[in-house]
C-alpha cells in the first residue's frame, strides 16, 4: 500500500510502499479515504514529545474511511462497508490505574488514560496510508450526512474542543455566554458546537484571519454573536462586559498556547465561571489565585474526548451541518504539508484525501 512516513526528524515526509496491516482478532481494517494534519503531527515529526518518535512511523491521527475487514472477535456494531471515523487512542488494557479509574466512574474501558494504550500517528502507524488497523471500541460509524473529508478533523480537533465544551458548560443553561479564545481549526469548530448547544458565543482572536474565518461562517445560525479583536485587551474586555451586561462570560475555552491569552481569559469569567485550557504554553504560566477564590472560578483541563462523547458530537454535527474550513491535498503533496501548514495565510484544517468521498 502507499504510505507516507517519517524518515528523518524535522524533514519532509517520505513516500513509499508498506505492507497492508494484518489485523488482530479484536481489530478492524479501515481503508483510509481522508486523514488530517494538525499541530501535534508537526510535534511528532520534530520529535518534541518526551517519548521519542519512532523513525519509519506513518503519521496522522485524524482518520476517516471505510471498514474493509473485521476481526473474528469483534461484535457486529461495525460491519463491512461502514463509513467510520477513528479516534487515535486504542486498546485499553483494563487493569492499569488509568483503566481502573475510568471504570470506577461507571465508564466503559477508556484507552485515553490507559498506561499501555496505543496511539495512532504518535507511536503507532496512523492514517497517511491506504489502510490502518483500528480499535472498534474507539471507531465510530458516521452519520450519512457527514462526509469523510469533514469527518477526519472531527476525530481530533473536533473531539478535543467538544470534550472541553461538554465539561466547562456542565450545569449551564441555554442562553448563557461561552467565549472561544483563538480561532483556528479548534476554535472554529468550538464556536459552532457552542452555538448548536444553545449558548451565546463570543469569538476572540488578535489575528484578522481568525476573525474573518468566523465572520464568513457557512451557516448564519452558527455565526458568533460577538466577534472581538483581542489585540487591545482593555478594549476587548469592555466590549465583552458590555455584551454580558457586566457579568462576564459563563465559560471560556482557550484554543491557543499563548500564556497571556490564558491569563487574560481568566479575567473574562463571571462569578463561578469556568476556564477550559486546550492550548499548551511552551512554559509554565502563573495566575492570580485571589479571583479564583473570591469569585469561585474553575480552571479545567480536557483531553480529547472518548468514544461516547464523540458519538454525541457527531449527532450534533449531522443535525446542524457543522463544518471545518478545509484545505484538501492529494497524497502526493504530503511532503509539502508542513510548508502549507506554516503559511501565514493558512486557515482551518488540512486534510489529505486518499480516495474520493463515498
Which residues fall in each region the model found?
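Glycine-rich beta-strand-centered segment in the early N-terminal region that forms part
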Residues: 21-35, 48-100, 143-145
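Short glycine-centered segments of the SAM/dcSAM-binding site in methyltransferase folds
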Residues: 83, 177, 273-274, 298
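NAD(P)H dinucleotide-binding glycine-rich loop of Rossmann-like/cofactor-binding domains
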Residues: 90-181, 216-217
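Helix-to-beta-strand junctions that scaffold the AdoMet/dcAdoMet cofactor pocket
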Residues: 173, 269-270
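Adenosine-nucleotide cofactor-binding segment
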Residues: 174-183, 195-261
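N-terminal Rossmann-fold NAD(P) dinucleotide-binding loop
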Residues: 187-188
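C-terminal hydrophobic helical "lid"/dimerization subdomain
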Residues: 196, 234, 239, 263, ...
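Rossmann-fold dehydrogenase core element
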Residues: 274-276, 287-327
Amino acid at each position: 500500500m502507499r504510505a507516507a512516513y517519517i524518515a528523518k526528524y524535522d524533514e519532509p515526509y517520505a513516500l513509499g510502499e508498506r505492507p497492508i496491516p494484518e489485523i488482530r482478532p479484536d481489530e478492524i481494517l479501515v481503508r483510509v479515504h481522508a486523514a488530517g494534519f494538525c499541530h501535534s503531527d508537526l510535534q511528532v515529526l520534530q520529535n518534541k514529545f518526551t517519548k521519542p518518535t519512532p523513525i519509519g512511523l506513518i503519521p496522522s491521527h485524524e482518520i476517516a474511511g471505510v471498514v474493509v475487514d473485521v476481526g473474528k472477535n469483534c461484535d457486529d456494531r461495525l460491519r463491512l462497508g461502514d463509513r467510520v471515523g477513528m479516534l487515535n487512542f486504542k486498546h485499553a488494557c483494563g487493569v492499569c490505574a488509568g483503566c481502573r479509574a475510568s471504570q470506577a466512574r461507571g465508564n466503559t474501558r477508556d484507552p485515553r488514560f490507559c498506561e499501555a494504550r496505543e496511539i495512532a500517528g504518535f507511536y503507532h502507524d496512523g492514517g497517511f496510508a491506504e489502510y490502518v488497523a483500528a480499535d472498534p471500541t474507539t471507531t465510530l460509524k458516521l452519520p450519512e450526512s457527514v462526509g469523510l473529508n469533514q469527518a477526519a478533523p472531527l476525530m481530533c480537533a473536533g473531539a478535543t474542543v467538544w470534550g472541553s465544551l461538554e465539561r466547562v458548560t456542565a450545569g449551564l443553561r441555554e442562553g448563557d455566554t461561552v467565549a472561544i479564545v483563538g480561532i483556528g481549526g479548534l476554535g472554529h469548530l468550538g464556536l459552532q458546537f457552542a452555538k448548536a448547544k444553545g449558548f451565546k458565543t463570543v469569538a476572540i482572536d488578535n489575528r484578522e484571519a481568525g476573525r474573518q474565518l468566523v465572520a464568513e461562517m457557512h451557516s448564519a445560525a452558527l455565526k458568533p454573536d460577538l466577534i472581538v479583536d483581542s489585540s487591545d485587551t482593555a478594549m476587548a474586555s469592555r466590549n465583552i462586559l458590555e455584551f454580558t451586561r457586566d457579568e462576564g462570560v459563563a465559560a471560556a475555552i482557550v484554543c491557543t498556547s499563548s500564556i497571556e491569552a490564558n491569563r487574560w481569559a481568566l479575567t473574562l469569567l463571571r462569578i463561578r465561571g469556568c476556564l477550559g485550557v486546550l492550548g499548551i504554553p511552551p512554559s509554565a504560566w502563573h495566575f492570580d489565585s485571589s479571583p479564583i477564590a473570591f469569585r469561585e472560578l474553575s480552571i479545567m483541563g480536557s483531553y480529547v474526548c472518548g468514544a461516547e462523547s464523540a458519538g454525541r458530537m457527531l449527532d450534533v454535527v449531522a443535525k446542524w451541518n457543522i463544518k471545518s474550513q478545509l484545505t484538501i491535498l492529494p497524497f502526493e503533496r504530503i511532503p509539502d504539508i508542513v510548508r502549507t501548514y506554516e503559511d501565514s495565510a493558512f486557515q482551518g484544517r488540512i486534510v489529505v484525501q486518499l480516495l474520493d468521498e463515498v
